[in-house]
Amino acid sequence: MKIKVGILGASGYAGNELVRILLNHPKVEISYLGSSSSVGQNYQDLYPDTPLNLCFENKNLDELELDLLFLATPHEFSAKLLNENLLKKMKIIDLSADFRLKNPKDYELWYKFTHPNQELLQNAIYGLCELYKEEIKKASLVANPGCYTTCSILSLYPLFKEKIIDFNSVIIDAKSGVSGAGRSAKVENLFCEVNENIKAYGLASHRHTPEIEEHLSYVAKEKITLQFTPHLVPMQRGILISAYANLKENLQEQDIRDIYTKYYQNNKFIRLLPPQSLPQTRWVKSSNFADINFSIDQRTKRVIVLGAIDNLIKGAAGQAVQNMNLMFDFDEDEGLKFFANL
């Protein structure tokens, strides 16, 4: 028997990827597409290549008969929308940032709004499957992680867990394709602005910084502060991070490989690449995989970790479906058994 799901925000890039994945999921039926601006429009008019013959509606959510609702909406939307009564009717996976951070003051500092739903904020489960699998299985509200956050935490988690690095020495240099900026029209995202151009943005102010710090602090069991700098590169999709950290002791590469293997050998979507094989975005394009590798610079006594994901799949829609699978006791990779599309 299939579960009935709805999507708010299916017109965006992450929302469209969510539709594409769910259409091929054997245990899901897409029953509702919510929109306030596109009511009556058929989804195929918006995305002719997507075989979903369903029109956008604008119903009161309390009227819906759904097992699960995905929210692929702008920040601050779901914080105002969700309530305990709705969560008694259906499960929620929120792809926005509205329930990712536990400290309400972080929303005032980083997102410039006062969180109106602090009780739900404390009850939401952070949907990074590789760290919080058991909690996700029992959750009614899951906060889907950010794209940079997913790649950064997965790349560094074993090092923090084993406490083999100086936590406050960590620097993360991240690069993302333009789809990470969303589908809305912005001058800085026009073809002539991004083509043949690489630029940094969000210097010392990117909103994924507190998210990365919060969950790596939880792993480390102490508050950590790190440096995170994102860059926009002229490609559609993909994230590559290069992370640097000082080693606490004299370790060899096999020592660190053993640590990563210990934590990731049974994970379906994390691929620790062979030595000398460095992650590339094209190897994970349109897939739910995270590719990771590392090297030690014996001269500087630093470990350099590389991670690559597709920002729209493992960094958004694919991870949301992975969370759904856990919440409904499906196989974790159900509907996600596809590889890179070169």
From Swiss-Prot:
Keyword DNA repair: no
PROSITE patterns for the chain: ARGC
UniProtKB keywords: Amino-acid biosynthesis, Arginine biosynthesis, Cytoplasm, NADP, Oxidoreductase
Top-level enzyme category: oxidoreductase
Subcellular localization: Cytoplasm
Subcellular location, principal: cytoplasm
Annotated function: Catalyzes the NADPH-dependent reduction of N-acetyl-5-glutamyl phosphate to yield N-acetyl-L-glutamate 5-semialdehyde.
Entry protein name: N-acetyl-gamma-glutamyl-phosphate reductase
Organism: Campylobacter jejuni subsp. doylei (strain ATCC BAA-1458 / RM4099 / 269.97)
Gene (UniProt): argC
